[in-house]
Each structure stands twice: as structure tokens, then as C-alpha cells.
Amino acid sequence: WVSSCWPILVYMFMSSKKLPHLKPLGIIALPSAVFCIIEPIMFGLPVVMNGFLLIPFILTHCITGALTYWLTSIGFVGKMYLNLPWATPSPLLGYLAAGGSIGGAVVVFINFAIGMVIFYPFWKAYEKSEVQKMEAEAVEA
């Protein structure tokens, strides 16, 4: 989830001046996101019914999953052999599940960076759309 959830959280905080209604959601979602509980973002933003965010959410998982598989197959990351609780924070999960391989934690940060790059144009389009909605509502009022 680090490749698709954390970029959304980062962009939510970065956009808090243009879209002030996202900051409280980000503050509420942050503690649970540390432990891989992303429902506040999935249904609060919402990602689920939002074409701007659903497309990169799915795309990011496909790309980072394939990359992680490839990095494991070439030996950069040790094979995952520990079954840890799903709520373990992501960098720690990567490190421990790979048997203490630092490569496991490094891959988590690589996946996060890839998620940031993939989400950027989609987030900008979402942000622009939301700003236009807010301006239209202000004109009506």
C-alpha cells in the first residue's frame, strides 16, 4: 500500500492550501496509514469512485508489484519467507519479511517514489477539477 496510499497522503498535505478540506482527512488518515489501514483515504477521498485517483491506484500496484517481483528474482531482495501481520508498517515489513535484508526496506522506498511519479499528473488533474468545483460553488453563493 505504500506505493499507492502514501503518495495520496503526501499530495493531500501538499495541496492543503488549494484544497483546505483535504487537510483534516489527511490528519485523520495518517496514523492509520502508518499501519496499512487505508480505508479513510479509499472511502473518504474517495479513491474508489474517482477516475482521477483509481487509475493510478491500480496502475501503481501493477508496476510496483512487477518491479518487486523482478528485484526478488535477481536477488536484490531476499525471498519473503516470514508471514508478518498485515498491519506492520511498510519499511519494517519489507525488512523483516525478507529475513532482515535491507533490500526489502529499500524496495519499499523505491515503490513509494514510483507511486509519487505515477500519481503526480493524475493528482494535478484531480486538484484542478476540485478547484474548479470550489470556484463554481463560490460563484453560485
Label every model-predicted segment:
Residues W1-F57, H61:
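Helix-loop-helix junctions within the multi-pass membrane cores of secondary transporters/permeases
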Residues M42-A141:
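Transmembrane alpha-helical segments and their short flanking loops
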